[in-house]
């Protein structure tokens, strides 16, 4: 059987047997088969078959991801992506099997998607969802923020407020986990399960350690609370409506796989409520202008930084006489920058600049040393091969910063992708932490303000609101719950549909986006992590040429961005009318 595909068996065997649905065993010279009905997720574990056997299975041969096919295929030469279905003499059996699979998926509902993403049974997926729902309903009872010594009605309203905040945080996790992990999954560096587990820890940590920086802007930087003096219940209803409206639109977007901006959702909802129920004077226009400008600047910055990072990789790694050694030398530098940035932004031991700088530098150096040793341990045998003069004879010469470089092959390619595979995992962690610190404010800001109004009888802008640690933890838990149950839906759009990603491209996009988001979080700007990441992925695509960016996907994403603010504002106005009627009846 002659196949028009070229597989990189060495690379696939060493890294991808456990992380993706493409491989060819080195010993059997086999082919990778994936279930025909699933272009992104595997329904069953990948089967590794020799060409002499099982040629009549109801499966389709899938061209491997560009990231782990030959380097020439993945880095600039024309790719042949025509999927060739294997001819099966038992066609009726094939149709029957596919119909049964679809029927089972429909029978299990959304749990089938979660089960496929994590490679677990639908029963297990349902059990996980039930545990999360039960925890969401019971944990608020034990939170201090529920209110101590308050009337029963106030406690019940506080309980409902915490649930609204959880709903918003849940949808942030469901939609925005792709900002941190989509490129890693798209390039094959992480599986869905690994991505979600990693994001869960780091999103929660970022929310706890950096959530207060942006939350204050969401509390007091959007609405002029003094306009609602004497109308505390109206403002309270408006804040709840903003959470409900933003959460509703995010859930719709997540269902269809649109990576919309959670920041757009919540800000649009709050502004819509303010304009209708408080007039133009209810909106803090100067602060809103600063926030809105960041929405335009952030994707541009993300695209620019990722473009430069990827061009630097191509210039200083791909075109180096020994790309493997060049990648091994560049990796600790990138790790140093990332670790030092997180240390100074999130965990400063002192506000005195020399001490904080020394701490950041020490953490960065330690991280770089540890990462260098990991690389030497895992890839040392391959790096030793590349030290011989014969290995680098056929490598391309240095030919300019913006040129199209053919790139390394063979052992050199394996080393470069191996190193950048590790680096992309670290950049995904970097992005998860930054995203948790920035986007948890979209749920916690209105939630904390609503609790303050309800329990203290003061408008959000009247006094400084201290954000309790349990409220930050509650928001972090909501994000983790959302990314666990629905996060896989949007990952496909970020990781697959904008441009083809490899570990080097994915690293460039994630590193650029995380840097921009972390810097904005430190300044207290609620920028759109979604805009930043999509811009960064597009920047990598532009670095490869305009034809490398899928215009249809970009148009669909931009269209969903444009309708987010008016939809959020409209829903907030409707929900406010409903909630004011309910509150007038209850109180």
UniProtKB/Swiss-Prot annotation:
GO terms for cellular component: chloroplast; chloroplast envelope; chloroplast inner membrane; cytosol. One of its GO terms (biological process) is phosphate ion transport. It is a multi-pass membrane protein. Residues 74-106 are annotated as: Disordered. Signal peptide: none annotated. GO terms for molecular function: low-affinity phosphate transmembrane transporter activity; symporter activity. Optimum pH is 4. Keywords: Chloroplast, Membrane, Phosphate transport, Plastid, Plastid inner membrane, Symport, Transit peptide, Transmembrane, Transmembrane helix, Transport. Residues 85-98 have a biased composition (Polar residues). Mostly expressed in young green tissues. Present in both auto- and heterotrophic tissues. Also expressed in root stele. Induction: Induction by light is inhibited by abscisic acid (ABA) and cycloheximide. Residues 1-71 form a transit peptide. It is found in: Plastid, Chloroplast inner membrane. Its main location: plastid. The chain crosses the membrane at residues 127-147, 154-174, 195-215, 233-253, 265-285, 289-309, 327-347, 352-372, 413-433, 465-485, 523-543, 559-579. Belongs to the inorganic phosphate transporter (PiT) (TC 2.A.20.2) family. Low affinity H(+)/Pi chloroplastic cotransporter. Involved in inorganic phosphate (orthophosphate, Pi) uptake in green parts of plants in Pi-sufficient conditions. Required for Pi retranslocation during Pi deprivation. This is Inorganic phosphate transporter 2-1, chloroplastic. It comes from Arabidopsis thaliana.
């Amino acid at each position: 059987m002659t196949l028009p595909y070229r597989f990189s068996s060495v690379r696939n065997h060493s890294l991808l047997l456990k992380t993706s649905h493409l491989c060819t065993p080195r010993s059997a010279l086999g082919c990778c088969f994936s279930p025909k009905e699933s272009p992104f997720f595997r329904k069953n574990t990948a089967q590794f078959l020799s060409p002499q056997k099982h040629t009549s299975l109801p499966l389709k041969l899938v061209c491997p991801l560009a990231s782990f096919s030959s380097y020439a295929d993945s880095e600039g030469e024309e790719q042949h992506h025509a999927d060739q279905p294997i001819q099966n003499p038992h066609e009726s059996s094939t149709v029957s099997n596919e119909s049964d699979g679809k029927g089972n998926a429909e029978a299990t509902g959304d749990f089938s998607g979660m089960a496929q993403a994590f490679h677990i049974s639908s029963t297990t997926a349902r059990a996980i969802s039930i545990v999360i729902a039960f925890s969401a309903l019971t944990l608020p009872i034990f939170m201090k923020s529920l209110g101590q010594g308050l009337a029963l009605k106030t406690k019940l309203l506080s309980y409902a407020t915490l649930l609204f905040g959880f709903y918003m945080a849940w949808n942030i996790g469901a939609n925005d986990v792709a900002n941190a992990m989509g490129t890693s999954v798209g390039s094959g560096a992480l599986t869905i399960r690994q991505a979600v587990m990693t994001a869960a820890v780091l999103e929660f940590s970022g929310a706890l350690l950096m959530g207060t920086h942006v939350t204050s802007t969401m509390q007091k930087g959007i609405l002029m609370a003094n306009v609602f003096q004497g109308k505390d219940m109206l403002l309270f209803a408006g804040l709840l409506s903003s959470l409900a409206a933003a959460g509703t639109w995010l859930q719709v977007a997540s269902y269809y796989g649109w990576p919309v901006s959670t920041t757009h959702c919540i800000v649009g909802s709050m502004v819509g409520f303010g304009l209708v129920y408080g007039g133009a004077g209810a909106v803090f226009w100067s602060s809103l202008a600063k926030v809105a400008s960041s929405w335009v600047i952030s994707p541009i910055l993300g695209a620019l930084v990722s473009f430069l990072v990827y061009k630097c990789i191509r210039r200083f790694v791909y075109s180096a006489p020994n790309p493997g050694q060049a990648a091994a030398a560049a990796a600790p530098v990138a790790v140093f920058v990332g670790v030092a940035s997180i240390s100074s932004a999130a965990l400063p031991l002192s506000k005195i600049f020399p001490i904080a700088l020394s701490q950041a530098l020490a953490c960065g150096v330690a991280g770089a040393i540890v990462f260098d040793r990991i690389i030497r341990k895992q890839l040392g045998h391959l790096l030793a091969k590349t030290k011989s003069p014969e290995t680098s004879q056929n490598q391309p010469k240095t030919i300019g910063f913006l040129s199209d470089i053919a790139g390394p092959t063979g052992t050199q390619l394996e080393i470069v992708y191996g190193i950048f595979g590790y680096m992309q995992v670290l950049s995904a962690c970097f992005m998860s932490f930054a995203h948790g610190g920035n986007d948890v404010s979209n749920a916690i800001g209105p939630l904390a303000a609503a609790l303050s109004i309800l329990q203290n009888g003061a408008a959000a802008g009247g006094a400084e609101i201290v954000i309790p640690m349990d409220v930050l933890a509650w928001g972090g838990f909501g994000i983790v719950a959302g990314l666990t149950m629905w996060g896989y839906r949007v990952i496909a759009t970020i990781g697959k549909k904008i441009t083809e990603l490899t570990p080097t491209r994915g690293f460039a996009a994630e590193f650029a986006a995380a840097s921009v988001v972390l810097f904005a979080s430190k300044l207290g700007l609620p920028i759109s992590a979604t805009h930043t990441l999509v811009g960064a992925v597009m920047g990598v695509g532009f670095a490869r040429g305009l034809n490398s960016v899928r215009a249809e996907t970009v148009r669909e994403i931009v269209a969903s961005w444009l309708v987010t603010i008016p939809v959020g504002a409209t829903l907030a106005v409707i929900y406010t009318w409903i909630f004011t009627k309910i509150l007038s009846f209850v109180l």
